């Protein structure tokens, strides 16, 4: 490698002997010189990069002669000079030694971190970025991802065109092969010369010196790590140009007629290569070498678009399947909610039924007894619920011995009584032509044989209980003839009651009461008899009674005694 001179101000270079070399010749002492170049201004040189760039040169060169007559302003850089790039990963900082950065680089110890030489993978792990799958994206050079700089050709593995493991997996394989390498001192085309200021003075170069065993490097905020190798136009020209020898070689093969055979052989080799990749995938996990082969073939023949189309189709299928899965999952969740609701409903129903069964059932109150309508001329009398009341005798009424008849005026009347044995008469509301009545007839045990007592039935209403002092009041209590319940018989007696309407010319009403002696009674004079009578009247008489409030007078009651 040709030597190149780097001009620095006098006195800025300090040579420090390393430990362990005290017994050797001072002229052969190795030192480490760190050159910290300031950012290169854009547009000063035609060959300058688009962005500001800086080169950090860590050199361990041998100074053969240090004499007083040698100008210290010029320092020879030989093959021992090493190029280093300041890199970062998260908050961690380190130096990438380019001459040790060989393909594939991931497990190669080429990073100096905390005075230790480690691999880029280990450096990413120590920086806490091990979750990132691509170590080239985790490591940054001047704030730019290392992968981006390698894809653009700004930096590449050391002697990548000679030493390649086919596992570098570069996305721009051909471009990297033909692109220029990192700047190496001694190569005139790749070394960035020290820029000068506008007034012609040399830009100051800060030089710091450290021993190889000392820890850490002093970082200057003015450092940048963007190192450009060539312009974009130069890269395109180099990638598109084909040498004359290559063209003549393939033309000669075609001229001699071997092109078909060569193409067939190339095709067979490629098929065997791809077939081997498929077979290895069946028997073993995917290897890095297989990935390198596929990547090189795809990039060489321009098949990356085909690979991308396959990936897009699979992505669409996966998205469609995911949508179907989400829809099915939502439907299952909905069915589960419905089943939960259905399982809860029987529980609620059973609980409700149980509560209803355990609830005390309240007996509905019996309906109130409807009030009976009566003529306005009558008076309402409330019977005593405790005991049967005794009523005053209504005159004129006569109770005669057997065979003698007596008469009652203004039937029905409220009460008939004589002495201590009252006679009670009750009425029912007007109904059809055929009336049925029932009551209990009893006779109080007394010394008088003429005493008759009529007690009211439970289904009858008492019309009047007015106490009568003379017979003149009877005419004022005349009421409409209603269905009459008239009972006046003792057990063992025969009574005949004839009711005659004196004012009616069409007919008369006859009420017959037949005796029904109680077969179980020991004393026929002290037992009650339940009688049923039917009152039959002529149609015309009953019709007249319903249409008008007609009065019946002069009813004769005949009591026959056996």
Curated annotation (Swiss-Prot):
Homodimer, and heterodimer of GMEB1 and GMEB2. Interacts with the glucocorticoid receptor (NR3C1) and NCOA2/TIF2. May interact with HSP27 and CREB-binding protein (CBP). Interacts with TRIM63. One of its GO terms (cellular component) is cytoplasm. Residues 311-357 form a coiled coil. This is Glucocorticoid modulatory element-binding protein 1. It comes from the Eukaryota. The modification N-acetylalanine is found at residue 2. GO terms for biological process: positive regulation of transcription by RNA polymerase II; regulation of transcription by RNA polymerase II. Its main location: nucleus.
């Amino acid at each position: 490698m040709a030597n190149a001179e780097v001009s620095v101000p006098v006195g800025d270079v300090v040579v420090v002997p390393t430990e362990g070399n005290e017994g050797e010749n001072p002229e052969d002492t190795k030192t480490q010189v760190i050159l910290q170049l300031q950012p290169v201004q854009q547009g000063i040189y035609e060959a300058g990069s688009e962005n500001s760039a800086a080169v950090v040169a860590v050199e361990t060169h041998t100074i053969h002669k240090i004499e007083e007559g040698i100008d210290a302003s010029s320092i020879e850089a030989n093959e021992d000079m090493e190029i280093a790039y300041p890199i970062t990963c998260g908050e961690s900082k380190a130096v990438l030694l380019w001459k040790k950065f060989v393909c594939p680089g991931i497990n190669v110890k080429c990073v100096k971190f905390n005075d230790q030489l480690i691999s880029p993978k280990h450096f990413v792990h120590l920086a806490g970025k091990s979750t990132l799958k691509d170590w080239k994206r985790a490591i940054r050079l001047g704030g730019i991802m290392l992968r981006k700089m390698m894809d653009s050709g700004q930096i590449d593995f050391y002697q990548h065109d000679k030493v390649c493991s086919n596992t570098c997996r570069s996305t721009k394989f051909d471009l990297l092969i033909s692109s220029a390498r990192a700047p190496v001192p001694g190569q005139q085309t790749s070394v960035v010369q020290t820029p000068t200021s506008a007034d012609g003075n040399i830009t100051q170069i800060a030089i710091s010196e450290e021993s190889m065993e000392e820890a850490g490097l002093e970082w200057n905020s003015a450092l940048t790590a963007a190192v450009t190798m060539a312009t974009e136009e130069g890269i395109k020209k180099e990638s598109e140009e084909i040498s004359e020898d290559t063209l003549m070689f393939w033309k000669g093969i075609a001229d001699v007629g071997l092109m078909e055979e060569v193409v067939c052989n190339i095709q067979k080799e490629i098929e065997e290569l791809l077939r081997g990749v498929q077979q290895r995938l069946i028997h073993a996990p995917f290897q890095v070498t297989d990935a390198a082969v596929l990547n090189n073939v795809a990039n060489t023949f321009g098949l990356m678009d085909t690979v991308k189309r396959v990936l897009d189709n699979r992505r669409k299928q996966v998205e469609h399947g995911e949508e179907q899965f989400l829809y099915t999952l939502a439907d299952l969740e909905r069915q589960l909610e419905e089943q939960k609701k259905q399982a809860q409903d029987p529980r609620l129903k059973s609980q409700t039924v149980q509560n209803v069964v355990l609830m005390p059932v309240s007996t509905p109150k019996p309906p109130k007894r409807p009030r009976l309508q009566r003529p306005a001329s009558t008076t309402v009398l409330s019977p005593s619920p405790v005991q049967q009341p005794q009523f005053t005798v209504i005159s004129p009424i006569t109770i005669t011995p057997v065979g003698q008849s007596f008469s009652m005026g203004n039937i029905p009347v409220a009460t008939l009584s004589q002495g201590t044995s009252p006679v009670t008469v009750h009425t029912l509301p007007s109904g059809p032509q055929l009336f049925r009545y029932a009551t209990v007839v009893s006779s109080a045990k007394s010394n008088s044989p003429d005493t008759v007592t009529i007690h009211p039935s439970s289904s009858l209403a008492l019309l009047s209980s007015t106490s009568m002092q003379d017979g003149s009041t009877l005419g004022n209590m005349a009421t409409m003839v209603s269905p009459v319940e008239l009972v006046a018989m003792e057990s063992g007696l025969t009574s005949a009651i004839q009711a005659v309407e004196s004012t009616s010319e069409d007919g008369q009403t006859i009420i017959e009461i037949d005796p029904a002696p109680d077969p179980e009674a020991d004393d026929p004079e002290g037992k009650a008899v339940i009688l049923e009578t039917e009152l039959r009247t002529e149609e015309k008489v009953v019709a007249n009674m319903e249409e008008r409030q007609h009065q019946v007078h002069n009813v004769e009651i005949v009591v026959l005694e056996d």
